Regions:
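Residues within mature, well-folded domains
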Residues: 1-117
C-alpha cells in the first residue's frame, strides 16, 4: 500500500526505470488534470515525448521511483487521444503497486500484459 505519493520534476529517474508490461490507458489532457503538466522530453530518438516522474513511500518506508511516459508515439498524438502510458520502475512489483494505487484512487484504466490488476 502506498503511504505517500509525490510528483517530481528533477529528471533524476528518467534512465533509472524500465517497463514491466503495465500501462495506463488515458489522454495526456486527463492525466495532466490529475498530475499537472508532464515534462516534455526532446529525445533525439523520439522514443519518449512526455513523462511524469513520481516517488512514493510504501508500507515498509521505502521510497520508490516511478516514471509514466508515452513510448514510441512517433506520430503526432493529440492531447485528447487515449494512448498507452508506460509505467517505468525498478521492478515489476513496484509498477504493479503503483498501477493499483493510482488506478483505484483516480479511476484510471490499467492495461497489463500478464497481470490481473
Amino acid at each position: 500500500m502506498i503511504k505517500k505519493l509525490e510528483i517530481k520534476s528533477d529528471n533524476k529517474l528518467q534512465n533509472l526505470t524500465s517497463y514491466h508490461g503495465i500501462s495506463i490507458i488515458d489522454s495526456r489532457q486527463h492525466l495532466s488534470s490529475i498530475f499537472g503538466c508532464p515534462r516534455r522530453i526532446d529525445s533525439g530518438d523520439k522514443k519518449v515525448t512526455y513523462m511524469w516522474e513520481f516517488v512514493y513511500t510504501n508500507e515498509k518506508g521505502e521510497e520508490v521511483g516511478i516514471t509514466l511516459y508515452d513510448w514510441k508515439m512517433s506520430k503526432v498524438v493529440t492531447e485528447t487521444a487515449r494512448i498507452n502510458w508506460h509505467i517505468g520502475s525498478k521492478g515489476k512489483s513496484k509498477a504493479e503497486e503503483f498501477a493499483k494505487y493510482i488506478g483505484e484512487k483516480y479511476n484510471l484504466e490499467i492495461s497489463s500484459e500478464d497481470y490481473d490488476l
